[in-house]
Amino acid sequence: MIKFLPICLFALTLPLLNRGPVSQPDTRHQEATSAADLFQPVDNMHHFMEYISEPSYKGLKAALATQPKGRKGWSPVKSGALILAETSALVAERVPEGADAEKATQWRQISLDVYNASKALYGSVGDYEQAKKHYSVMIDNCNRCHQAFANGKYQLKK
């Protein structure tokens, strides 16, 4: 009788093997929604800009004042451009409270313009003329946002 027990157990589990892998409910969307709810701004946009974007801007301005030399000279340019590109993507999702649909669209478009210019600046590392050009476009886009959403305050100098 004991000899037949493994055969009986195998026979009982055989139909389960034909069903394919046991599937779990797809909770990716639910988890993403929950994660989005968890990540709320720590502070207001003014402080976000002051403590994240402004140091990167100042570092870029100093690094591009003269032509950087070698990898060490270009490192602050890469760092600043990368930080500003990635933070502009984050800023795009933080539309000002009370913004109507038109203002929200404008906010996201300017954020995208800053992102594209910062990304181009990052990609131009090693080419001083191209880097200066992309830096200038990026600053123009930052100032467009400050004009539209901060009543013209905080205009950046190239």
Kindly give the residue locations of the regions a language model identified.
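Bacterial N-terminal signal peptides
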Residues: P6-P15
